[in-house]
A protein has these predicted regions:
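Flexible, compositionally biased loop and terminal segments
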Residues: 1-216
Length: 216
C-alpha cells in the first residue's frame, strides 16, 4: 500500500456501479449469468481492498429498481447470487465486525423476495465501531426513489407538527437518505464504459468525481 497518496488526499467514500457483467460473459462465449457470478467474486475482492486502504464507506450498485425489466431467468439468477452472498454474510457477520467493517443493504428492501428481506435484516449488525468501514449493498435501489423516500419522511414530520415547512433544509433531505450519517461519495466508478449515473446516488453525488472506464 506504499504507493497510496497521503490520507488527506484519499477518498472517504467510493461508489461503484456494478455493470458490464453481461457483456463480459458474451465476449467470452459464456451465459450472462456467469458474468454475474464473476462480478460477485470481484465485489468481495474490491470490498476487502477498500477496507485495507482505510476507506470509511463503499456503496455498490448491485440491483436497481429498473433491473426488474430484465429477462426472468436473469433476475432469478441474480436473486440466487444475492441469497448466497447474504447467507454467507449472515454467517460471518461477527467475524466481519472483528475485522472492522459492517454491511448495510440499502434500497426498497420491501420489494425484494421475503427470504432476501429476512437475510438483509439478519446479516446487518448495529454499528458499534465508529472507525469501521461501512459497505452499502444497494438492492432494488433507485436514486429518485430514495429522494421520494426522504421527502415522504419530511412530509410525515410536517403532518405531525414536528417540522415547519419553512424550516426544511438540505440537511433534512440528507438525513432521509439511506446513506445518512456517511460522507457523500468522493468518487464514483463505472467500469463498463457507459457514461451515465443510471439513477445511482442522485442526491449524494452532487460534488462527486467520476471515473468511467471500459475494462470488460
Amino acid at each position: 500500500m506504499s504507493n497510496l497518496p497521503p490520507k488527506e488526499f484519499m477518498p472517504k467514500h467510493i461508489g461503484i456501479i456494478m455493470d458490464g457483467n453481461g457483456r463480459w460473459a458474451r465476449e467470452r462465449g459464456l451465459p450472462r449469468t456467469e458474468g454475474h457470478v464473476q462480478g460477485a467474486k470481484v465485489f468481495k475482492q474490491i470490498m476487502d481492498y477498500g477496507h485495507d486502504i482505510g476507506l470509511e464507506a463503499m456503496t455498490f450498485y448491485a440491483f436497481s429498481t429498473e433491473n426488474w425489466k430484465r429477462p426472468k431467468d436473469e433476475i432469478k439468477a441474480l436473486m440466487q447470487i444475492f441469497h448466497e452472498y447474504l447467507t454467507e454474510a449472515d454467517e460471518t457477520k461477527y467475524e466481519r465486525e472483528k475485522r472492522g467493517f459492517y454491511l448495510r443493504v440499502i434500497g426498497d428492501v420491501s420489494g425484494l423476495p421475503m427470504t432476501l428481506q429476512l437475510l438483509a435484516k439478519s446479516a446487518c449488525l448495529a454499528m458499534n465501531n465508529k472507525d469501521a468501514m461501512v459497505v452499502n449493498m444497494a438492492l432494488n435501489y433507485g436514486g429518485r426513489q430514495e429522494i421520494v423516500h426522504a421527502v415522504q419522511q419530511i412530509a410525515e414530520k410536517v403532518k405531525k407538527g414536528e417540522l415547519d415547512p419553512k424550516d426544511i433544509s438540505e440537511d433534512d433531505i440528507s438525513a432521509g437518505m439511506y446513506t445518512a450519517g456517511l460522507p457523500d461519495p468522493d468518487l464514483i466508478i463505472r467500469p463498463s464504459g457507459e457514461l451515465r449515473l443510471s439513477n445511482f446516488l442522485t442526491w449524494q453525488s452532487a460534488y462527486s468525481e467520476f471515473w468511467f472506464d471500459d475494462i470488460a
